[in-house]
Regions:
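Cys/His-rich zinc-coordinating "finger" modules and their low-complexity flanking regions
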Residues: 1-574
Length: 574
């Protein structure tokens, strides 16, 4: 907006009143942002109204020297600067924001408010019959109380119900009454008093619930309850109030149709029937991969296509087409990755193919998308839960030693398990050993021993999990056994690169790390010489047997992002 004044420099600075009654922001003026509407200055701190596009320095605004405030009627409040008073806590009595210049203060009562709480005083009374049958009255004073709605402590300005003896935070009066959360299949409703009962722990944070305080409870599940603040967390609730919205049972289409006792038609492979494999069918198929989870068929019950090489574990064939997930607030839909495409799981950060659970913006592979609470792992004695507070951005995974965002945590001990480690196959096969390898970890009192990987012959950190053979005593790094591409299907092309099983007589050189690939699979891309040599300047050692092309190999995801290889292995949308 245009400057309100344009006075000469030798005249006293004029001041203006704020031309609106909207909430103000206290921001830094910069040349790229705007200028003061009074003095035309483009630097310093100013008050800004986003609705009116008005901004002005505090010293350019005409503020009253004293004010009367309805929440402090005993004494007038005087305009002062925060730096002139050293006995306050530096925060506004009502909104608890940091006080800035100017503030209004009563020295007799040590009562301070900011400009917004002077111009927009809090409501003295609040009556919301849907929330409570009585009127709540503001107590504008510093007083320690326990909120009857959320169970959290407050230190000032509670709203009080004289008839019931309730004290609430102002924000807790407006808590939604009926909601859905991603930790429970049914709706939960707010109550100010749970009442006696075996409520156990909160369904989100897993801490104890006080039956005498407010919470959310499920009408269908008599002992299920969630703390009020836990239920409305951004990572738990999608923000939709469901009061007065009819609850209708969602009809989710079955993933397959039954043809007979042995055959089905699955939605992802409707062109052919899938037949249930018997015990005699396992031989010869144990190395085949399930097209849903991209793990070996092994000895698990499975379906196989009667006409083509398509396999599904029986468990994967029964995956629901729509479900809730503890890591997302919306329901996820089961989809099939199209040929030539690949995904990156938002929780375990792995590149994957096969089935995926998707929302509008995020993708989960079926392993992470199928995790539910409580989660039990054979290498940990206690159940695990997805617990994350706002202050805990990253947690240390006890399996791989990395700090991760999406983890499953133990409420008994301080153990955390990342999603990638939680979904590791319990048993695998490797060329280094004739037996099945199983997941292992070294007990705390034995972690001083030195272990070596039988694949790469490097040291193996005993503080992290590894694969080992109980018969031979062999030990291997998890990455040496699985590699980075264990969630992709060998033989398929991703972009212009093909995933190839590393079962040749010799190990090939990687384009990036310049080492021979020791992992179970690698990416291979062929580039025409005319393009590679002239435009990209590929080194001569990359030439294949054919004089007309280069062949590139990448042994890991880090190597796949090499400046040469990235041309052929397209990056994933994060």
């Amino acid at each position: 907006m245009e400057p309100i004044t344009d006075q000469p420099m030798d005249q006293p600075k004029q001041k203006v009143k704020i031309p609106c009654n909207h909430m103000l922001l206290y921001i830094h003026l910069t040349q790229s942002y705007s200028y003061c509407a009074v003095c035309n200055g483009d630097y310093g701190l100013c008050y800004y109204c986003s609705r009116c596009n008005f901004q002005a320095h505090s010293e350019c605004i005409e503020w009253p020297d004293t004010i009367d405030h309805p929440s402090h009627s005993r004494h007038p409040l005087k305009k002062v600067s925060p730096g002139t008073i050293d006995y306050t806590d530096g925060k506004c009595h009502f909104c608890r924001e940091e006080l800035v210049d100017p503030m209004y203060h009563c020295s007799l009562c040590n009562f301070s408010i900011d400009v917004n709480c002077w111009r927009h005083p809090p409501q003295r009374t609040i009556y919301q019959p849907k929330s409570h049958e009585h009127t709540f009255t503001l107590m504008p004073r510093k007083i320690t109380f326990t909120c009857n709605a959320c169970g959290m402590l407050g230190d000032c300005n509670p709203y009080f119900c004289f008839e019931c003896g309730f004290m609430l935070h102002k924000d807790c009066i407006d808590l939604p009454r009926v909601i859905n959360i991603n930790r429970h299949d049914h709706r939960i409703s707010r109550t100010y008093h749970l009442g006696h009962g075996d409520w156990g722990s909160c369904g989100v944070c897993r801490k104890e619930i006080d039956w005498s305080l407010g919470a959310y409870s499920c009408k269908r599940c008599p002992n299920y309850a969630v703390h009020s603040k836990c239920a409305i967390r951004e990572d738990v609730w999608n923000g939709e109030e469901l009061e007065d919205v009819p609850e209708e049972e969602e009809e989710i289409e079955d993933p397959y149709k039954v043809v007979n006792d042995k055959e089905i038609i699955h939605f992802c492979h409707e062109e052919h029937n899938l037949r249930l494999g018997g015990d005699d069918d396992v031989t010869g198929y144990e190395k085949m991969l399930c097209d849903a989870c991209i793990t070996p068929i092994s000895s698990d019950p499975f379906f196989k296509c009667v006409q083509c090489e398509f396999f599904l574990h029986k468990v994967c064939a029964s995956l629901p087409r729509r479900k809730r997930n503890i890591m997302h607030t919306e329901k996820l839909d089961l989809q099939v990755t199209k040929a030539g495409e690949y995904n990156k799981c938002i929780s375990c950060r792995k590149i994957f193919d096969g089935f995926r659970y998707c929302s509008r913006f995020e993708k989960f592979d079926v392993r992470c998308g199928s995790i539910s609470e409580p989660f039990h792992h054979e290498l940990h004695p206690h159940p695990l839960y997805h617990i994350l507070s706002a202050a805990e951005k990253l947690k240390l995974c006890g399996a791989c030693g990395k700090y991760l965002h999406y983890v499953l945590s133990c409420t008994v001990c301080e153990f955390n398990l990342g999603m990638d480690c939680a979904t590791l196959p319990r048993k695998v096969r490797h060329i280094c050993d004739a037996h099945d390898l199983s997941l292992h970890h070294v007990p705390g009192n034995s972690k001083g021993q030195q272990l070596w990987c039988d694949s790469c012959e490097g040291k193996l950190d005993p503080s992290v999990w590894f694969y080992g053979c109980d018969d031979c005593g062999s030990t291997l790094h998890i990455k040496c056994v699985l590699g980075d591409f264990n969630h992709l299907k060998p033989g398929k092309k991703y972009g212009e690169a093909e995933l190839v099983v590393n079962d040749g007589m010799t190990r090939l050189f990687c384009i990036s790390c310049k080492k021979r690939c020791s992992f179970p699979s690698f990416l291979k891309a062929t580039c025409p010489n005319t393009l590679c040599e002239q435009r990209w300047g590929f080194p001569s050692f990359l030439k294949a047997a054919s004089p007309d092309s280069f062949v590139l190999f990448a042994c890991s995801m880090d190597c796949a992002y090499d400046k040469y290889f990235m041309l052929w292995f397209y990056e994933v949308d994060y």
